[in-house]
Amino acid sequence: MKKVIAAIGLFTAGFSLIAPALADRGNDDRDEHGDGRSALAVYGDAPYGCKAPTAAAAPDECPVGSAYKPDSPDGPNPGDPRQLEATPAFIEAVNNDRKVSLVVHVGDIHSGSGYCTLAYNQRVLDLWSDYKDPLVYMPGDNEWTDCQKSKEGGGVKNSAGEYVDYAAGHPVANLSLVRSMFFPQAGETLGRHKREVTSQAQAFDPAHPSDAEYVENVYFMQSQVLFVTMNIPGGSNNDDDLWSAGAFGATKSAPQIQEAAQRTAADLRWLETAFAVAKDRGAKAVVIVSQSDMWDLDGTGPALTHIANYEPFIAKTAALTKDFGKAVLMINGDSHHYRSGNPLVDNAPCVVETGVGTATAPCAEDDYDTHPYYPDGVPNFHRLVVHGSTFPLEYTRLTIDPRKNYPASANAIGPLSWERVIP
């Protein structure tokens, strides 16, 4: 039996710029209920590994009796393996949810203290092969940008003098590894029953041929709603956290600067393309999926400076949403705690997860203050952060009913509604 956790919250919409080479491949408008409705299971930050049990660690992360493995260069991937071990049952529960016809993972397949290895990636990929429905995946910062950190194995060698991480933790090399393993065919999802989507590798602007590298950026239509994914990693959009391991020193390197600038530009063009497609097809809403929680003051200081490089994405999203005029939902992972609200409206209602496995409570702070926009705000926007990293494992069931037009709340907007599900 599944436990459904109630929530309470708000929503958004966008702009139109028809980019060259708009591909129409694989964007059939799925109707899984015969009446236009469909539902997705959305989650992230799993399978995760808890931090070592210390006085400072959250009490739910490594409970007494957990099989925590010390961080040792000569040992297996460090961390608590319980979520990996629980993943088959979780996948089975999602498969048995008769309402769900598509799965979305918003990134982070291991913790910020786990090694970045081909073997670990393969283990997760093998587990995911049991999803019967299509699986759309967006890589998180722990899979690539943070691989250079020593706590993820960056620059760390074992007793044989070998680097424990793939490519010594080189971020670009690890993103290439993730692409080769999880995106072997552009425009095709994971899962046993794959479906076609449109990838930026297929529908890139010919004026910017390097955009074809971003095979992980996709869009697709589902029940008259356009979904678009963008590779925006958590932390600082990979701009402020220096690549300090492997071949990189203690200052920002040219490869790091180039990577962030090129990806940011490609993402913004992709977002414009997606909204143009949504307007062209008469979509009733747009759902934006990215890993980063761009409003999260994560304790890395100075906090506002650390998230300042998300400004181009938020400004573009706000402008496109206002122009679109219909509901726009952004779904993020990254910060681990379920959150529902509209950070593009000052003092908007907001709810946040107050403890593992519990319902929500009003937010203590206003995310609008970190990226303030427009005197009148963007009322047709809503942002949802899905739960992750801790037990119990859960997913958010996102239901689309194109016949509905819900007022903005903590658990619905436009044709979209959602609920937290603990299998």
For the regions a protein language model found, what residue spans apply to each?
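A short C-terminal boundary segment appended to hydrolase-like catalytic domains
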Residues: 382, 390-423
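Active-site glycine-centered loops adjacent to acidic/histidine catalytic or metal-binding residues
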Residues: 45, 107-108, 140-141, 291, ...
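N-terminal active-site segment of His-dependent metallophosphoesterases
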Residues: 24-119
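Short, solvent-exposed loop/turn elements at domain surfaces
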Residues: 38-40, 48-54, 229, 236-240, ...
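Extended active-site neighborhood of metal-dependent phosphoesterases/phosphodiesterases
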Residues: 61, 115-263, 337-340, 345-401
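Bacterial N-terminal signal peptides
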Residues: 7-16
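His/acidic metal-ligating clusters that form di-metal
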Residues: 87-102, 221, 228, 242-345
